[in-house]
């Protein structure tokens, strides 16, 4: 059993990149950017990430107490989490209203592209007519498999469109990934292309993509590709900014070294690393003032565009959010109620739906 979080290391502590939806960590109130200082009575300082992850795992139903340090909270606080078998559904889909589809992608797993295609076809048949709008929700999506992110992008872009490319010092670190089936179907791409039967109108349906500071890596690749090709409006808050490629180098003594060997770039040449994806329309979720991103971390891989005055074809960076007063961590937990994403209390989702309705009204007039 586990907790259901994507993690890294920062200053010797475990950094929560994103809690995965519907897992124990998400339900308990862990947030993107939290630092875990203790696992039960064991201090995290001095542990490797693998050692810390092993301590977080355990028998389903058993509990672990995490000591958490959160930006905007004046002292560390304890959070008890009950371990469980982590079985996440990477694609959730529904018609939120007639003619409006909502697709939630929580992670990029092996079957995510295929599940997305099935969901789109099912909703399209249920709706009977072409959609007036599609919302693709990748908030708190920590990433996953690169080929699955290409598949999700390919569902909405034209065949042959560039999704992402990488650049690094080593010649074999350079690659261009387009929406061609061979980049997301492992065996016999032409025969097994699960996107080939998608209704043609899906490619032209107005889209909004929702992101936040918990959207990292593969989800940033999808958002960047759809933004650069002007296929979708990006709504929410700036994403995490994890745009580096890691490679594992085996050593003679049976160990291995994990090295950062390249960076991801969007089709227009923007590096995701440390910058993230900036929304076309910023809609706060009430948590952005205490958000932590890759750019807030120490010793991060630099972005090659840091010295340029402006990112190529990137939207203007939104104004800085005012700092929030510190609060008591336990009080924050007592008041914590997870917002049902895609529900009536989800401000960002409701704004996305209003944007799509506005586009439809404009087209009709």
Predicted regions and their residues:
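PDZ/PDZ-like peptide-tail recognition elements
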Residues: 1-18
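PDZ domains, with a preference for the canonical peptide-binding region formed by the helix
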Residues: 35-67, 148, 242-248
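C-terminal "post-core" interaction segments
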Residues: 91-365
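Conserved PDZ fold ligand-binding element
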Residues: 25-48, 135-137, 228
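A generic structural motif
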Residues: 8, 67-71, 250, 265
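PDZ/PDZ-like domain micro-motif
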Residues: 21-34, 89-92, 196-197
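PDZ-domain C-terminal substructure recognizer with occasional recognition of PDZ-binding tails
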Residues: 12-14, 37, 51-92, 260-261
């Amino acid at each position: 059993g586990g907790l259901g979080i994507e993690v890294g290391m920062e200053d010797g502590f475990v950094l929560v990149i994103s809690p995965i939806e519907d897992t124990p960590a998400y339900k308990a109130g862990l947030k993107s950017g939290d630092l875990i200082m203790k696992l039960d009575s064991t201090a995290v300082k001095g542990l490797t990430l693998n050692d810390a992850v092993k301590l977080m795992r355990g028998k389903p139903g058993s509990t672990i107490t995490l000591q958490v340090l959160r930006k905007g909270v004046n002292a560390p606080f304890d959070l008890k989490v009950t371990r469980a078998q982590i079985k996440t559904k990477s694609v959730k889909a529904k018609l939120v209203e007639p003619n409006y589809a909502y697709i939630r992608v929580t992670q990029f797993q092996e079957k995510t592209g295929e599940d997305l295609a099935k969901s789109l076809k099912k909703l399209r048949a249920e709706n009977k007519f072409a959609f007036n709008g599609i919302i693709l929700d990748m908030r708190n999506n920590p990433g996953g498999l690169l080929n699955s992110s290409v598949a999700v992008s390919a569902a909405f872009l034209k065949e042959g469109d560039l999704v992402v490319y990488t650049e690094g010092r080593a010649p074999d670190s350079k690659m261009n990934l387009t929406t061609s089936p061979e980049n997301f179907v492992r065996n016999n791409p032409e025969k097994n292309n699960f996107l080939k039967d998608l209704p043609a109108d899906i490619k032209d349906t107005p889209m909004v993509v929702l992101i936040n500071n918990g959207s990292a890596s593969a989800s940033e690749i999808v958002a960047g590709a759809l933004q650069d090709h002007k296929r979708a409006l990006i709504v929410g808050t700036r994403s995490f900014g994890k745009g580096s490629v890691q490679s594992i180098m085996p050593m003679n003594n049976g160990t291995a070294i994990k090295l950062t060997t390249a960076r991801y770039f969007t089709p227009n040449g923007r590096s995701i690393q440390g910058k993230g994806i900036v929304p076309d329309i910023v809609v706060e979720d009430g948590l952005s003032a205490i958000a932590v991103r890759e750019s807030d971390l120490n010793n991060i891989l630099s972005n090659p565009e840091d010295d340029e005055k402006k990112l190529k074809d990137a939207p203007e960076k939104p104004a800085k959010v005012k700092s929030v007063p510190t609060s008591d961590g336990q009080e924050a937990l007592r008041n914590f109620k997870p917002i049902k994403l895609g529900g009536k209390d989800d401000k960002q989702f409701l704004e996305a739906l209003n944007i799509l309705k506005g586009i439809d009204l404009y087209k009709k007039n």
